[in-house]
Curated annotation (Swiss-Prot):
Localization (cell): Cytoplasm
Top-level EC class: ligase
GO cellular component: cytoplasm
Catalytic reaction equation(s): tRNA(His) + L-histidine + ATP = L-histidyl-tRNA(His) + AMP + diphosphate + H(+)
Database matches in Pfam families: HGTP_anticodon, tRNA-synt_His
Protein's gene: hisS
Top-rank lineage group of the source organism: Bacteria
GO molecular function: ATP binding; histidine-tRNA ligase activity
CDD domains for this protein: HisRS-like_core (cd00773)
Family that this chain belongs to: Belongs to the class-II aminoacyl-tRNA synthetase family.
Source organism: Prochlorococcus marinus (strain MIT 9515)
Subunit note: Homodimer.
Protein known as: Histidine--tRNA ligase
Biological processes annotated in GO: histidyl-tRNA aminoacylation
């Protein structure tokens, strides 16, 4: 029993750690609500075929990183490695029309068998935002701006936006033919991993971290040179609109998102706050995905943010938790019953209530309230129980007028008046 522990690449998030997580999530969800983006929840477990068709068999995610197994019905199942394919499947399966515009978000655990490191785990958490049915340049800009605003709102420093265009299907097809011809001549100079990608997923060679291969690729054909006039115009419009919105960016023509379903706009947001440029957000347009998976042709664009890395980068102030408003000190059987009943009533207000369940002496309970920096305390002992009342007072601010009061358990009006006065609660309670 003593040897039982979590799997490598998974982490227990304990209450103190979760304070920052919850604060970060709250800020994100408030911003998404204001942007009229609605939540969607899809299963963590999906049929393996979904990701093979949606992400692409030649990707590292599918070929190396997925957690896949046969269930008791001999069906191949996979713990989701990302969220976009599941959203696309849900759109198709639930008969959502291609003409129905959807702004969706999801947040939850994903699974990839990677080498664990700071900000990257095998079970990791991801925020995803998907705009389904939108094909205008404006939607590309809105999705980039939304991702940028989330990161800025969280106080993340040294942000850099990199953009590229992957063109449409024909652009990529024409480029790939030229690139494969170039690879025939230069493949032996590439690193082994890049050579293996030639057959499976040649565009992913541009993702290489190998310095020598990067240098060689500088002489390779550029996808940008194969863009149609329409694709080029779209890309120019995106750059112009980003400039007007004062969102700084740099062009990175080697930026190829790691999944096969991307078209046109591709972008990444990185931060140098951890000492090196770490990718915080990645996204792009995927107009072919839903059609590729058996649905009708539906344009879409989205992004994903890894929460583990986001937590590392987010501001220190987000580690602070809301302090206890009222600590209920109680001692004696009848007092304990009254304290439980009162705590239930107080939870109807926008206050943090801590009910002491220890049965310890009053002095020890006072020390606990002080340690928690509670703004006020309620005292219920045998005397208060006999009088059917409780004492409430500000804990460390006795100079405030009306800082203390004795209130009957039935006198809700007097209780609300004291709470409104000392906690500045909504006067319409």
């Amino acid at each position: 029993m003593n040897n039982l522990k979590n799997l490598r690449g998974t982490v227990d998030l304990l209450p103190d750690n979760l304070i920052k997580w919850q604060n970060v999530e709250k800020i994100i969800l408030e911003l998404l609500l204001r942007a009229s983006v609605k939540e969607i929840r899809t299963p963590i477990l999906e049929m393996t075929e979904l990701f093979m068709r949606g992400i692409g068999e030649g990707t590292d995610v599918v070929s190396k990183e997925m957690y896949t197994f046969l269930d008791r019905g001999e069906r191949s199942c996979t713990l989701r490695p990302e969220g976009t394919a599941s959203v696309a499947r849900a759109i198709i399966q639930n008969g959502i029309s291609s003409k129905s515009l959807q702004k969706l978000w999801y947040m939850g655990p994903m699974f990839r068998y990677e080498r664990p490191q700071a900000g990257r785990q095998r079970q990791f958490h991801q925020l995803g935002v998907e705009f389904i049915g939108y094909d205008s340049v404006r939607s590309d800009i809105e999705i980039i701006a939304l991702a940028w605003d989330i990161l800025e709102k969280l106080g993340i420093k040294e942000l850099n936006l990199e953009i590229n265009t992957l063109g449409d299907f024909n652009d990529r097809s024409n480029f790939q033919k030229a690139f494969l011809k170039w690879l025939e001549v230069n493949k032996n100079d590439l690193d082994l991993d890049s050579q293996n990608r030639i057959v499976k997923n040649p565009l992913r060679i541009f993702d290489t971290k190998n310095a020598k291969t990067k240098s060689i690729l500088e002489d390779a054909p550029k996808l940008f040179d194969f863009l149609s006039e329409k694709s080029l115009k779209r890309y120019i419009n995106i750059k112009e609109m980003l400039k007007l919105l004062k969102i700084p960016f740099i062009e990175n023509f080697n930026l190829v998102r790691g999944l096969d379903y991307y078209t046109h706009t591709a972008f990444e947001i990185t931060s140098g706050a951890l000492g090196s440029q770490a990718t915080v957000c990645g996204g792009g347009r995927y107009d072919n995905l839903i059609n590729q998976m058996g649905g009708t042709e539906t344009p879409a664009i989205g992004f994903a943010i890894g929460l583990e890395r986001l937590i590392l980068l987010a501001g220190k102030d987000l580690e602070e938790s809301r302090e206890t408003d009222i600590y209920i000190v109680n001692k004696g059987f009848q007092a304990e019953i009254l304290a439980i009943d009162l705590s239930r009533k107080l939870r109807n207000y926008d206050l943090i209530i801590e009910l002491d369940l220890s049965g310890a002496s009053f002095s020890k309970q006072f020390k606990k309230a002080n340690k928690l920096k509670s703004k006020s305390i309620i005292i219920i002992g045998d005397d208060e129980a006999l009088k059917n009342e409780f004492k409430i007072r500000l804990f460390n601010n006795i100079n405030v007028e009306n800082h203390e009061a004795n209130i009957s358990f039935e006198d809700d009006i007097k209780l609300e008046k004291w709470l409104k006065t000392n906690f500045l609660l909504d006067k319409n309670l």
